[in-house]
From Swiss-Prot:
Family indicated by similarity: Belongs to the universal ribosomal protein uS2 family.
UniProt key word Transferase: no
CDD domains on file: RPS2
Protein name, entry field: Small ribosomal subunit protein uS2
Taxonomy, superkingdom: Bacteria
Gene: rpsB
Alphabetically ordered keywords of this record: Ribonucleoprotein, Ribosomal protein
PANTHER family attached to this UniProt entry: 30S RIBOSOMAL PROTEIN S2 PROKARYOTIC AND ORGANELLAR, SMALL RIBOSOMAL SUBUNIT PROTEIN US2M
Family annotation (InterPro entries): Ribosomal_uS2, Ribosomal_uS2_bac/mit/plastid, Ribosomal_uS2_CS, Ribosomal_uS2_flav_dom_sf
UniProt GO BP: translation
Cited Pfam families: Ribosomal_S2
Keyword Transcription appears in the UniProt entry: no
């Protein structure tokens, strides 16, 4: 049985690619045709890729792999946070800061700073500071929550990065590849499938398409972790 049906993908607009002049020729094997100057993605191929991605992700979760969801564009931001939280993954949904992976020791220190500030705020310690100092600390807290809030539970580097919009998140791709971190990537017709281990050809601009794909991947992670827990109980 297919993880996602053709009708679900059609309704989500997953088949709409970019304008033909913006395509990457490496995506040709996933393109069905061109219509009115826009490439149409072959959803039969997408369904097959999604089946593979589901199994791969489920098995990775079952073996204890750690996941990071990345998608900072406006139409993906809320979905990335929602689905990452649902499956217990870390996430980046506002802005990719250089060195988030390759300079992990520094990033980890900033995350600890965020946790310290949150403890200070909840305990009332910030409120007890002079007004100007409290304002500075709260601005720092707000900034760290915005950019690093989704990483608070990530104690080590992830094993897998789940990506929305390969081109926009090119720095995340470069850092992951430099560290041999696996990439599960939604690929629109302007992307390069050679830059990821697990390709999912689909529209990465439509909210419903992003919701559909990330939702299924989150399901796979939850299913894999349940299987891992069941094995430990035996």
């Amino acid at each position: 049985m297919a993880v996602v049906s053709l009708s679900e993908m059609m309704e989500a607009g997953a088949h709409f690619g970019h304008q033909t002049r913006r395509w990457n020729p490496k995506m040709s094997k996933y393109i069905y045709c061109a219509r009115n100057g826009v490439h149409i993605i072959d959803l039969v191929k997408t369904a097959l890729c999604m089946n593979n991605a589901y199994k791969w992700t489920r098995n990775a979760a079952k073996s204890g792999k750690r996941f990071l969801f990345v998608g900072t564009k406006k139409q993906a931001s809320d979905v990335v946070a929602q689905e990452a939280v649902r499956c217990g993954a870390a996430y980046v949904n506002q802005r990719w800061l250089g060195g988030m992976l390759t300079n992990w020791s520094t990033m980890k220190a900033r995350i600890e700073r965020l946790k310290d500030l949150e403890r200070m705020e909840s305990s009332g310690a910030i409120a007890m500071r002079p007004k100007k100092e409290a304002a500075v600390l709260r601005r720092e807290l707000e900034r760290l929550q915005k950019y690093l809030g989704g990483l608070k539970g990530m104690r080590r580097l992830p094993d897998v990065v789940v990506l929305v919009d390969q081109r926009r998140e090119s720095n995340a791709v470069l850092e992951a590849r430099k560290l041999d971190i696996s990439l599960v990537s939604m690929l629109d017709t302007n992307c390069d499938p050679d830059l990821c281990e697990v390709p999912i050809p689909c529209n990465d601009d439509a909210v419903r398409s992003v919701q559909l794909i990330l939702g299924r991947l989150a399901d796979a992670i939850n299913e894999g972790r349940k299987g891992s827990n069941d094995q430990r109980k035996v």
